[in-house]
């Protein structure tokens, strides 16, 4: 059963939040986040600013999957991770 847009947004947010909080990420997490960002980019109906966010996330995941020092890479991108998680959570707020 394919994931709907909200499920993909939630999973992408969860992966980025995990990177942000744990300061580590696996190659498979980067690859999964990159695939999610790409499929979301292919969706119609998103405004240009969030499409730019998906592109930035995709670039982050491509570089992160190849980076020699994952912890340092995440620390260098901590501000971006904060912004991306907030943006994604605004699109799909967690149930309270």
Language-model-detected regions and their locations in the chain:
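Alpha-helix boundary/N-cap detector
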Residues: 3, 7, 28, 45-48, ...
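Charged low-complexity stretches with an acidic bias
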Residues: 56-96
């Amino acid at each position: 059963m394919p994931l709907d847009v909200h499920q993909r947004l939630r999973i992408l947010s969860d992966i980025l939040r995990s990177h942000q909080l744990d300061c580590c990420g696996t190659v498979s997490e980067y690859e999964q986040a990159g695939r999610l960002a790409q499929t979301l980019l292919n969706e119609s109906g998103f405004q240009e600013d969030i499409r730019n966010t998906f592109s930035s996330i995709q670039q982050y995941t491509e570089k992160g999957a190849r980076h020699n020092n994952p912890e340092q890479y995440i620390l260098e991108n901590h501000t971006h991770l904060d912004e991306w998680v907030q943006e994604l959570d605004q699109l799909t707020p967690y149930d309270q």
